[in-house]
Structure formats: C-alpha cells, structure tokens
C-alpha cells in the first residue's frame, strides 16, 4: 500500500506470533529467541524482555538463547514473515484469528504478488504487486492456485496442462518419471523428517523399550526405495541431513532381532497379550501406503497387530 517496510514491522509480527491468546500454530519457531518461550507460555508478559528489537528502520537485533546455526534458515518459514500492523488492527485485535484483514481488498503485504480473489475450496488468484521493491523483475501478472485433495487428480491436471506447477507427485508415478528422466520432474532437498508420534500416556507405549522396539522394526531403506520412490533418503536421526552445524553421532538401525529382544524385556515375550495399536494418518494415498508398509513390518518383525485410521488434516 506504499507504507515503508521497517524492522519494527518484524518486531510487532513476532510479538503477534508469540502472543499466547492468538494460539499460533508455530510459536516454537521463535523459541530460540531469549524469553520467547516464556512470553508465549505466559511466564513473562513484557515483550521487551524477548530477544528482538529494532535498532533503527533497517536494523534488527536478535538475541538467541544459544548458538543456533540454522536460525537464518528458520526465517524462511512463513510463521516468521511480517504482517501489516495497521491492517491487522483495523479489522480486529492482535490475537483475532477471524479478522477480515486477510480478505481480498483488505490484505496488505510486501511481497511480489497481491491477493486478488479467494473462492474458498475453489481457487486463489494473486496478481503482480506494482509497489514491490523489485517489481520490474516480476515476470508474471497473475498466479492461480487450486486446492486439489487427490494427488492422482493433481498429477493428471498437470499432465493435461491445467496446472503449470505441482509440488506433489504420486509415488508410483514419481518412480516412472525418474526412470524416464522426465525433464518436468525436479527433486530438491527438503528440510523435514517424516515421523510418527507415539502416545506415551497409554500402555504399552509408555514403555521406552516398546517404543525402541517399534522403531528398530522399521526398514527405512525399503520405505524409501520401494514405497515413497521419489528421492527421499532414510531418516536415521530426527534432524535431517543438511542442517547447518549438525551431524548425528548415532543412527537408528533396522534390527528386528534387537527389536524382539527389547519387546521381551518390556514383558512381551509373547505378543499374544500385546494390545492392538492404531496408526492415525492424514488422508492421502501416499500416507496410506507408508502406514500399510509399517503395519506389515510390525506384524512380520514383531507379531503386533495394527489398525489404520485416516483423518483429514
């Protein structure tokens, strides 16, 4: 809208993300700042105690709780991006999750594109922002985004020319595209780890030996080569390779024999008394295939029965 973008915009935006009553999904992205977690959890209420301040319009000072080599990488996550304070407060309070500031005609940003229209569950259209600082290098006049829930449908739309870009390729198609050397396929490193979270408040998952047995019984190499098939690499530690300044000292092995030993030490020499486990996964054919494969691995390696349940995410 022509307003200057300043360091103070970032300070206010980060305060908003950390405001407890907003209920932000990713406040922990900023927990590396001094006092950020305490502010978000209500231990302190004065944001000036948090390790971020604007020294002038173009200088931001950040104080971290400890050396964080990947901090600059974290700032590429959208939860850390600035929002326009005046627009947010024009249509509500700092913690208003239903404010109209995100609607077309109201939304103000500092990016190369502006929000033009938003048809819920149909289409989002953004148009070139003439006030963007580097607008002359923005080649596109508009971009259209379509929410497609089925990845196979999305892949067919891409091949039919209805989409110019898709970030999701069905695993069974990705393997074929890789073998063919399809020039439309591009695989880039992704800073993320695919994992299941165990409910440690229920038996027998409250037993660490049971949890270790479950993870040792998963053949990650097979998962990436035979199931996902799109360039993923086995996750032998929680932090993915490529994280600046981090190299895991140990790796999680695939060791069914050790898994069975740990299960016996946990009191399950026979799995007849082991309760049926449930894997809850978000609706997607690829997620279903991974869940099915892990279900089979746990059954074959440990004799454990597993039920699968999907839910929209």
Language-model-derived ranges and their functions:
Residues 1-26, 61, 157, 204:
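Aromatic- and charge-enriched surface segment that lines or borders ligand/interaction sites
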Residues 2, 164-165, 184, 299-313:
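Periplasmic binding protein-like
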Residues 2-4, 9, 152-162, 179-180, ...:
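Short helices/loops that flank or line small-molecule/ion binding pockets
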Residues 10-13, 60-61, 111-114, 124-125, ...:
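Short, well-ordered beta-strand elements
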Residues 10-14, 62, 143, 210-223:
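Bilobed periplasmic-binding protein/Venus flytrap-like ligand-binding cleft at the lobe interface
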Residues 36, 47-48, 57-58, 63-142, ...:
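Gly/Pro-rich hinge or "lid" segments in bacterial periplasmic/extracellular proteins
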Residues 116-127, 144-202, 221, 225:
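Extracellular/periplasmic solute-recognition and catalytic clefts
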Residues 127-128, 206-300, 307:
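Append "and occasionally in soluble cytosolic enzymes with long acidic Gly/Pro-rich linkers
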């Amino acid at each position: 809208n022509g307003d200057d973008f300043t360091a103070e915009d970032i300070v206010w935006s980060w305060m908003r993300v950390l405001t407890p009553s907003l209920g932000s999904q990713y406040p922990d992205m900023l927990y590396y700042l001094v006092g950020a977690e305490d502010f978000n959890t209500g231990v302190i209420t004065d944001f000036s105690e948090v390790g971020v301040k604007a020294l002038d319009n173009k200088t931001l000072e950040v104080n971290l709780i400890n050396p964080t080599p990947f901090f600059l990488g974290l700032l590429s996550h959208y939860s850390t991006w600035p929002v326009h304070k005046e627009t947010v407060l024009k249509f509500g309070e700092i913690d208003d999750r239903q404010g109209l500031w995100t609607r077309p005609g109201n939304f103000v940003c500092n990016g190369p594109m502006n929000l033009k229209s938003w048809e819920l569950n149909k289409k989002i259209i953004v148009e070139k922002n003439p006030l963007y600082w580097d607008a002359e290098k923005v080649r596109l006049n508009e971009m259209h985004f379509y929410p497609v829930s089925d990845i196979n449908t999305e892949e067919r739309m891409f091949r039919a020319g209805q989409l110019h870009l898709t970030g999701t390729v069905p695993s069974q198609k990705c393997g074929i595209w890789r073998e063919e050397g399809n020039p439309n396929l591009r695989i880039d490193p992704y800073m993320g780890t695919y994992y299941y979270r165990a409910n440690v408040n229920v038996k027998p998952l409250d037993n660490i030996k049971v949890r270790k047995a479950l993870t040792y019984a998963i053949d990650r190499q097979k998962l990436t080569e035979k199931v996902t098939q799109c360039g993923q690499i086995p996750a032998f530690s929680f932090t993915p390779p490529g994280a600046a300044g981090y190299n895991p000292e140990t790796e999680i092995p695939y060791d069914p024999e050790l898994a069975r030993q740990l299960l016996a030490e946990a009191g399950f020499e026979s799995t007849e008394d082991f309760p049926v486990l449930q894997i809850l996964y978000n609706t997607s054919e690829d997620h279903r295939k991974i869940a099915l494969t892990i279900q089979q691995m746990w059954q074959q390696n440990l004799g454990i029965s597993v039920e699968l349940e999907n839910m929209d995410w």
